[in-house]
Amino acid sequence: MSQLATLHIDKQAHKFSAAHFTIFSETERERLHGHNYGLSARIVAAMGDNGFSADYNVYKRALQRLCDNHDEYMLLPSQSRWLQVAEEEGEYLATFNGRTLRFPTDETLLLPITNVTVEALAHYLLNLLMEEADMGDLLELELFVSSGDGQMSSACWRAP
């Protein structure tokens, strides 16, 4: 049996700032606010005969691209049953409980998730990471999303 290694990538630079609001119900949501989100990863792979399991640099670069692509945007969910989003003249019109908020389309990301939470972001960003990075001989890839010190969620992929 080959030896397994678990790599942890938790770099200070893997952060992005974004605005959002969480939707709690048909009539309740948070006020618009922002977070300095952090991304980190846990990678499990078999060690090769050279004592090497996975290239940190591949995953560090991929995590940085995810951060860069989401930095300084308003994040809106496109699949919420309680938020209707329409596009009109360079703006997203986000209607919740009878109130419409306007966001410039070039400063807003419409994400394929039901709510902008660390849980939903973890799954969404893990899928993007898996599309971009070569999974190679990885056995597990877990992506962590934090929205502040001491609070985070993760999503995990395991090889079949």
Residue ranges and their predicted role:
Residues 1-160:
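Charge-rich, low-complexity N-terminal segments
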